[in-house]
Amino acid sequence: MNRLKGKTAVITGGNSGIGLATAQLFLEEGARVIITGRRADAVKQAIESLGSEAFGIISDAGNMTDVRTLPGEVKKITPQVDILFANAGVGLFAPFNETSEDLFDSNLNVNFKGVFFTVQGLLPLIPNGGSILLNSTILVHSGLETTAAYSASKGAVLALGKTLAIELASRKIRVNSISPGPISTPIYNKMGMTEDVLKEFAAAVQAKVPLKRFGESRDVAQVALFLASDDSSFMTGSEVSVDGGKSKTF
């Protein structure tokens, strides 16, 4: 219960889904946690549920002004960030021929540009031996129609993680990526489907998962805990898929 005792973690997009579940687990393991989110009401509600060792910052990962000012806001709370989980992301989908420049930019701005410059901005606060986690997707390896811009943005994240692992190895900062498969998170409610179509889509996806269920946010959080802690001290540049075996099927 004390794998992160004395550590401070920053989790972007920590007010819901995977980010919130990870914040809860990190707190259980002794960390102080700073979450970010773009909606003040959602961040406030999350902080109230997390307790006194959690802090919130209103910050939109797709807004470069917010990304640039985030390090200063973090420094008002802590001088050091032992763990950074660049988790904030969006999933905006359309057939390739119907993908607008706005949809393309929205995916890339949040999922890659925001991640890139969030890590760059907070890196001076990360001590030698720190841990950086990035959130990618199994869709990088297995194509799915309508996800071209989204999958490309997450593929860039995965490439970033491998590069940073080499660049930061001299400081013993480990950089690893998590690639979730079908996880029950609020992102599915933002796909623009009617409730009936969403249920049909979910059933079709679940049928293709060897473990025959959607994952829960806590399933991903457990992997984040492993990668953030000393339990994974000899892992860097790695990708861990959390997908119930989905990426191993034809």
Where are these regions (language model features)?
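Conserved glycine-rich cofactor-binding loop
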Residues: 8, 15-16
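Short, flexible catalytic-loop segment of classical short-chain dehydrogenase/reductase
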Residues: 40, 158, 175, 180-190
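Substrate-binding pocket helix/loop in short-chain dehydrogenase/reductase
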Residues: 95-96, 100-108, 205
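Active-site loop immediately N-terminal to the catalytic Tyr-X3-Lys motif
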Residues: 96-97, 129, 142-148, 170, ...
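Active-site helix of classical SDR
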Residues: 119, 153, 161
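Alpha-helical segment proximal to the catalytic Tyr-Lys
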Residues: 124-125, 166-170, 233
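Short C-terminal tail/terminal secondary-structure segment
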Residues: 142, 225, 236-250
